[in-house]
Amino acid sequence: MTCYLRKAKMDDCDLLFEWANYPMVRLNSFSTKPITYDEHVNWFRNIMERKDCVQYIYMEGDKPIGQARIQICDDMAEISYSIIPEKQSLGHGHEILSDICDEVWREFPNVTKVVGKVKPDNIASQKAFERAGYEEVCRVYEIKKNDINNPN
């Protein structure tokens, strides 16, 4: 069945809220705490009004199976994406990452690169990015103020 991206509508708010709180989505997110409904609604309204962000729903026929969001900053687009659990490990990750590039190049001609950030233990997403033609260009290291191993 053919898969494609469509722009999100306000009606997608509850669906995206459900997906955002899937345990694996929270685990692979850079912000792992659960999201409250009020937080999500406020965030979603903001995203839908912004000119530098576009939220997409990834469709398989008439069934939503994932989401992708881009945020534009000058000549760069940063992507965030997820696929519903029952459709993971079927190749949809690299497909959505390829499709989002096509959307970015068409909608934002000034953008020259698309960037995705992946946690070190999210091997499936790393492989999806690589299979879609992205290449790893750096690693980011951080230390938090109250980390036990912080020597300061």
Identify the meaning behind each predicted range:
Residues 24-42:
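Conserved GNAT-fold acetyl-CoA-binding loop/helix
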Residues 27, 36, 51, 146-148:
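A short hydrophobic/aromatic micro-motif that marks alpha-helical segments and, especially, helix-coil
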Residues 2-4, 36-47, 69-72:
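Charged, low-complexity, helix/coiled-coil-prone segments
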Residues 1-15, 19-20, 55, 59-152:
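Acyl-donor (CoA/ACP) binding surface of acyl/acetyltransferases
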Residues 45-57:
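A short helix-loop-beta-strand connector motif used in the catalytic cores of GNAT acetyltransferases and
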Residues 22-25, 34, 49, 88:
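Residue-level marker of structural boundaries
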Residues 16-21, 40, 44:
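Hydrophobic alpha-helical core bundles mediating ligand binding, dimerization, or RNAP-core interactions
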